[in-house]
Amino acid sequence: MAKVFYNGDINEGVLQGKTVAIIGYGSQGHAHAQNLRDSGQEVIVGLRPGKSWDKAAEDGFQVYSVREAASRADVIMILLPDEHQPTVYKNEIEPELSEGKTLAFAHGFNVHFNQIVPPATVDVFLAAPKGPGHLVRRTYVDGAGVPGLVAVYQDATGQAKDIALAYSKMNGSARAGVIETTFQEETETDLFGEQAVLCGGTSALVKAGFETLVEAGYQPEVAYFECLHELKLIVDLMYEGGLEYMRYSISDTAQWGDFQAGPRVVTAETKQAMKDILSDIQTGKFAKGWILENQANRPEFTAINEREKNHPLEVVGRELREMMPFVKAKSKGVVGSAKN
């Protein structure tokens, strides 16, 4: 069973007198910074000049260049997109990592795949709330919290785990529960979930369903509602009470269709494909491809992204959403939000 820590298990005193630098002020960055500050922690923000700098300053933080913030801080939490972290780390953070400092992440990708190799003289931990930044902040303000993960990659001082837990407590996660994990487990399961289920699997399933109906002569508008729009209704039920509550809430006809058709859509071959995807993640094949894609300035990523925007599902969806002002597009930073 997983080891879970709550507020009463954690001594936040290990952070007393220390300065925490939040590097990045996006989806997760603004939430971490404000939550820790409201918990009584000394917090500064490290950024490059731009809108985020102005926003952090407006929110009352002392804002510095990344290198200056890293120099001033005892604990440095990097909350930048994965693809930007290695360069920023190498040029602006690593030179300021004196012995005994702490380097922190909310996603283990760059450490696990050796894109960031910290010196042996610093602590390295992961503190990852399992929710988007706006929810991390809102639940904290409401007196609750989003569950989180915590892991130690390197313990140079003997206090890395205590510091990681204290950070998670101050961010509100220990109000709900903090699960101990490893950088490897967090990274590999996070990538697998995104690729096989949450993003890759779901978007491919929705498109295939839409295309099947349209190719059979049904109106694209009706196909959109049945295959994409109503997905939220089902996912919300699953989110609230698992598959059991979803099945309790739908009609018996829908539930019987679930039992009969589901195994025909997701077959043994589908599960084998999932295992192959997991293998690509575990061996580093996926990471290598993504790193090379970024080094080449993302030609394939950009081409696929543009093609997908013009899929008939997207075209009809944009038209239908104009009929539904109650449907508002949310900002990026939900799945993989720790990267922002």
UniProtKB/Swiss-Prot annotation:
Protein's organism: Halalkalibacterium halodurans (strain ATCC BAA-125 / DSM 18197 / FERM 7344 / JCM 9153 / C-125) (Bacillus halodurans)
Family: Belongs to the ketol-acid reductoisomerase family.
Gene Ontology terms: cellular component: cytosol
Gene that produces this protein: ilvC
Alphabetical GO biological process terms: isoleucine biosynthetic process; L-valine biosynthetic process
First-tier enzyme category under EC: oxidoreductase
Binding site residues for Mg(2+) 1: 190, 194
Residues involved in NADP(+) binding: 25-28, 48, 52, 82-85, 133
Keyword entries, A-Z: Amino-acid biosynthesis, Branched-chain amino acid biosynthesis, Magnesium, Metal-binding, NADP, Oxidoreductase
Pfam families: KARI_C (PF01450), KARI_N (PF07991)
Residues at which Mg(2+) 2 binds: 190, 226, 230
Alphabetized InterPro entries for the sequence: 6-PGluconate_DH-like_C_sf, KARI, KARI_C, KARI_N, KARI_prok, NAD(P)-bd_dom_sf
Pathway note: Amino-acid biosynthesis; L-isoleucine biosynthesis; L-isoleucine from 2-oxobutanoate: step 2/4; Amino-acid biosynthesis; L-valine biosynthesis; L-valine from pyruvate: step 2/4
Assigned EC number: 1.1.1.86
Cofactor detail note: Binds 2 magnesium ions per subunit.
GO molecular function: ketol-acid reductoisomerase activity; magnesium ion binding; NADP binding
Record domain KARI N-terminal Rossmann: where: 2-181
Protein name: Ketol-acid reductoisomerase (NADP(+))
Taxonomy of the source species: Bacteria, Bacillati, Bacillota, Bacilli, Bacillales
Sequence positions that bind substrate: 251
Cofactor(s) the protein requires to work: Mg(2+)
Active site per UniProt: 107
Task of the protein: Involved in the biosynthesis of branched-chain amino acids (BCAA). Catalyzes an alkyl-migration followed by a ketol-acid reduction of (S)-2-acetolactate (S2AL) to yield (R)-2,3-dihydroxy-isovalerate. In the isomerase reaction, S2AL is rearranged via a Mg-dependent methyl migration to produce 3-hydroxy-3-methyl-2-ketobutyrate (HMKB). In the reductase reaction, this 2-ketoacid undergoes a metal-dependent reduction by NADPH to yield (R)-2,3-dihydroxy-isovalerate.
